[in-house]
């Protein structure tokens, strides 16, 4: 059973602040909340519309970051080896594609998105920190990674707040895996960062799918 369609969504204010800081590039429009007694109220339908739009743009930006990193370090030996990459989220029981997501209950799908986002909280900090230590890394790559981290953090806060409001399940213990990048070998660190960005790219494609499937569910959109 879904909760009331109109709820106070304080996290929306955070996302709107993100937008005002020009972090919401390519989002043409977004719903505004209604103010009542100094509190922000927004329908869950509009909330998912907002989250779906933002997640899609982040997914595109992560793919761009991955392509730029791969192109810049294409001369590093073995960088593009197609051996299976084991990501920090590989153990999470989450839907692998859109078809599976469509068959997943909305509550479980929302939890899946939250699990992936939570699993990236510390690794995103490590990613931005380690990128700045690599020799000759372009400023644009560091800038994009920093920008993406801020946006993903906003989405994570929003999804967790939304999950708490919709599912009313309280805080659950989080077991977030670590990602170790320590190495004195420059090429080894580049390989690790490449794998890390590749995993982030794959994982955020999943988050994008989940939030947009949820948006279609909430808005009752067919053939989405």
UniProtKB/Swiss-Prot annotation:
Leader sequence residues: 1-29
Single GO MF annotation: growth factor activity
Tissue expression notes: Expressed in placenta and hair follicles, with highest expression levels detected in the outer root sheath and no expression detected in bulb. Expressed in placenta, skin wounds, keratinocytes and weakly in embryonic fibroblasts. Expressed in brain, cerebellum and in Neuro-2a cell line. Not detected in liver, kidney, ovary, pituitary gland and brain.
Keyword list, A-Z: Disulfide bond, Endoplasmic reticulum, Glycoprotein, Hormone, Secreted, Signal
Xref: InterPro entries: 4_helix_cytokine-like_core, Somatotropin/Prolactin, Somatotropin_CS
Record-stated family: Belongs to the somatotropin/prolactin family.
Main location: secreted
GO CC list: endoplasmic reticulum; extracellular space
Protein's name in the database: Prolactin-2C3
TM region(s), chain numbering: none
PTM comment text: N-glycosylated and sialylated.
UniProt-annotated glycosylation sites, renumbered to this chain: 19, 57, 75, 88
Tree of life domain: Eukaryota
Cysteines engaged in disulfide bonds, as pairs: 33-40, 87-199, 216-224
Gene Ontology process terms (BP): hematopoietic stem cell proliferation; positive regulation of hematopoietic stem cell proliferation
Function: May have a role in embryonic development. It is likely to provide a growth stimulus to target cells in maternal and fetal tissues during the development of the embryo at mid-gestation. May play a role during wound healing and in the hair follicle cycle as a growth factor and/or an angiogenesis factor. May play a role in microvilli formation and cell proliferation of neuroblastoma cells.
PROSITE patterns linked: SOMATOTROPIN_1, SOMATOTROPIN_2
Localization per Swiss-Prot or TrEMBL: Secreted; Endoplasmic reticulum
